[in-house]
C-alpha cells in the first residue's frame, strides 16, 4: 500500500480520519462525535506522555524472531503437508523408491487431514494421498512447500498407489497432539522419520536400526524463541516502536500471498464458497469484506488450491484470519503502509501469544485466537489504547470462545467468518465502552488472565472433547 499524496500543507485522508480516534465518544440525538488527533506520537515511537519508548533489546530481538519463525509460507493445509514432508524425507533417507509406506499419527493429525484436499493432488484427500504424493513427487528440502514441484504424472501415480493400498496409517495414542512417523520400506531395508510438536520439526531419523539423527523434543535450537515473553502490553509497545525494516520482509510477504489466495477464493468456486456468498448476500461494506476475504482464502486453501499462504501458529487458516481483515480495514481507513505493518505486528503476535497456551493442535478452533488478533489490530488502527485493545480481545473470547475444531475442511471458512464477525463486534462494543465483566464465564480480571483461561480450556478442558470428535470421525463410537 502506498501513502496517498497530499497537497502541501494538507493531511492525507488517513491523517484526517484515523490516527488517533479518541475513545470518549459523545452521543447526542443519535449523532456520534469523534474527536480526532494526530498520531505522530505513535509513528515517532513516543508514548502518550511524549517519552521515547524503548523495549529491552533481548525482548525486541525475541519478538522479531518470533515473527520470522512463525510467518513462513506453506503450500496447502499444513497437516497434510507435514505428512508429505515426513514421507518425502523418509524416502530421501532410504535412497530408493520404497515398496510401501507406513504412517503412524496422532489423533489431531488424522482429524486435520481426513477431510481436506491435498494440494497439487487434483482433488484427492487423505493421509495416504499426502504421504504417497510426498514420496512420488515431493522435494523434502522445500519443507512446507514440499509439494510445489509435483507433476501431473506424479498425481496419476499417487492415485494408482493409493487405490492399491500402498500406504497404511494407524492411530498413535498417548503422544503429542502433533505427532507423525513415516516409515518407508524396500526389501529388507527401511527408513523412518519422526516429527513432533511443529510441522517441520524432525526429532528422529532412523535407517535400518541405526539412529542417524535425534533431537530432544524441547531442544533449544538456533531457531528457538521464548514465547513466554509475549504479553499484550509489550506487544503494543513493540508494535509502536519497532523499526519497520526489521519486519518488513515477513509482513510484505504475508500481505501479498494471503491477498492473492483471497482473490483466488473470490474468483473461483472453491469449497462451500463462504467468502463469495457473504459478498453476494450482504454487500461489500468493510465489515463484510473483512470476513469475506478471510473466508475466501480458506475456501481456496481447504479446496486444494496450490497457492502458498503465510501461516500463523503453524496454520494457513489462522495466517489468513490474522491478516486479511486487518488489510481490509486499513484500506478503508486510508492507512499508510507503515500503519498497516504496525497493525499486522499486533494481530500476529496477539494470536501467537494466545496459541502458546492452547498448543499447536487442539479441539479449540484456532480461528478464534486468530480473530482475537485481527480484532486487536483493528482497534489499534482506530487509535485504541491498551485498555481498548484488551476489551476487544476479551469481548471476542467471551463471544465465540467455545467453537470446536473438528478437522480441516470446507467449514473452516465459515468458522473464520463467524470468528472475525465476533472480533469486529468486540471492537465496536469496546468503542462504546461495553465489555464482558470479570466472573462472567471464563472472563478474568484482566486480558492476560482471560487469555490464560481460554488456553486452559483449549489445552486441558477439551482433551476428551478432542478424543470424542475423532471417535465420531473414524466411526469408533455409536452416536444415538
List where the protein language model places each region:
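Hydrophobic alpha-helical bundle architecture
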Residues: 91-93, 119, 329-342, 352-418, ...
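Signature of multi-pass transmembrane helix bundles
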Residues: 162-304, 469-480
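Acidic-glycine-rich active-site phosphate/pyrophosphate-binding loop
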Residues: 54-64, 98-109, 285-304, 336-354, ...
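Short, positively charged and aromatic/hydrophobic N-terminal segments
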Residues: 21-45
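Early transmembrane hairpin of solute transport permeases
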Residues: 81-180, 184
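Conserved phosphate/anionic-ligand binding catalytic regions in large, soluble enzymes, centered on
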Residues: 73-89, 307-324, 365-369
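Flexible, glycine/charged-enriched surface loops at secondary-structure junctions
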Residues: 55, 97-101, 142-147, 169-170, ...
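A structural signal for small-residue-enriched, beta-sheet-centric alpha/beta enzyme cores
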Residues: 74-78, 108-112, 119, 196-200, ...
Amino acid at each position: 500500500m502506498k501513502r496517498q499524496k497530499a497537497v502541501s500543507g494538507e493531511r492525507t485522508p488517513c491523517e484526517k480520519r484515523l490516527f488517533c480516534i479518541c475513545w470518549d465518544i459523545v452521543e447526542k440525538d443519535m449523532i456520534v462525535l469523534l474527536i480526532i488527533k494526530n498520531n505522530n506520537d505513535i509513528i515517532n515511537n513516543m508514548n502518550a506522555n511524549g517519552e521515547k519508548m524503548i523495549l529491552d533489546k533481548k525482548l525486541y530481538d525475541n519478538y522479531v524472531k518470533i515473527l520470522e519463525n512463525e510467518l513462513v509460507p506453506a503450500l496447502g493445509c499444513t497437516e497434510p503437508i507435514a505428512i508429505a514432508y515426513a514421507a518425502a524425507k523418509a524416502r530421501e533417507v532410504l535412497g530408493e523408491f520404497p515398496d510401501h509406506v507406513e504412517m503412524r499419527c496422532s489423533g489431531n493429525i488424522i482429524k486435520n487431514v481426513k477431510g481436506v484436499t491435498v494440494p497439487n493432488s487434483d482433488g484427492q484427500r487423505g493421509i495416504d494421498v499426502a504421504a504417497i504424493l510426498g514420496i512420488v513427487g515431493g522435494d523434502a528440502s522445500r519443507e512446507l512447500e514440499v509439494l510445489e514441484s509435483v507433476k501431473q504424472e506424479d498425481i496419476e501415480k499417487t492415485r494408482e498407489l493409493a487405490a492399491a493400498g500402498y500406504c497404511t496409517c494407524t492411530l498413535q495414542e498417548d503422544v503429542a497432539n502433533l505427532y507423525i512417523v513415516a516409515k518407508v520400506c524396500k526389501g529388507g531395508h527401511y527408513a523412518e522419520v519422526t516429527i513432533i510438536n511443529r510441522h517441520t520439526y524432525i526429532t528422529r531419523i532412523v535407517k535400518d536400526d541405526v539412529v542417524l539423527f535425534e533431537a530432544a523434543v524441547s531442544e533449544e535450537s538456533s531457531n528457538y524463541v521464548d514465547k513466554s515473553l509475549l504479553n499484550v502490553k509489550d506487544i503494543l509497545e513493540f508494535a509502536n516502536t519497532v523499526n519497520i525494516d526489521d519486519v518488513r520482509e515477513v509482513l510484505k510477504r504475508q500481505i501479498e500471498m494471503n491477498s492473492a489466495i483471497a482473490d483466488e477464493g473470490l474468483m473461483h468456486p472453491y469449497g462451500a464458497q463462504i467468502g463469495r456468498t457473504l459478498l453476494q448476500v450482504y454487500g461489500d461494506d468493510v465489515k463484510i469484506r473483512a470476513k469475506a476475504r478471510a473466508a475466501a482464502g480458506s475456501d481456496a486453501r481447504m479446496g486444494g488450491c496450490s497457492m502458498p499462504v503465510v501461516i500463523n501458529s503453524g496454520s494457513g487458516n489462522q495466517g489468513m484470519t490474522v491478516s486479511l481483515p486487518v488489510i481490509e480495514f486499513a484500506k478503508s481507513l486510508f492507512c499508510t503502509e507503515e500503519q498497516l505493518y504496525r497493525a499486522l505486528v499486533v494481530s500476529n503476535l496477539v494470536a501467537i501469544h494466545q496459541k502458546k497456551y492452547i498448543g499447536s493442535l487442539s479441539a479449540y478452533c484456532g480461528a478464534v485466537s486468530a480473530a482475537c488478533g485481527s480484532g486487536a489490530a483493528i482497534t489499534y488502527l482506530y487509535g485504541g489504547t491498551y485498555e481498548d485493545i484488551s476489551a476487544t480481545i476479551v469481548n471476542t473470547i467471551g463471544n465465540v470462545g467455545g467453537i470446536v475444531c473438528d478437522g480441516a475442511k470446507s467449514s473452516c471458512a465459515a468458522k473464520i467468518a463467524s470468528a472475525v464477525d465476533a472480533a469486529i463486534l468486540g471492537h465496536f462494543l469496546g468503542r462504546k465502552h461495553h465489555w464482558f465483566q470479570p466472573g462472567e464465564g471464563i472472563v478474568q480480571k484482566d486480558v492476560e488472565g482471560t487469555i490464560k483461561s481460554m488456553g486452559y480450556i483449549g489445552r486441558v478442558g477439551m482433551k476428551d472433547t478432542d478424543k470424542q470428535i475423532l471417535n465420531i470421525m473414524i466411526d469408533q463410537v455409536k452416536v444415538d
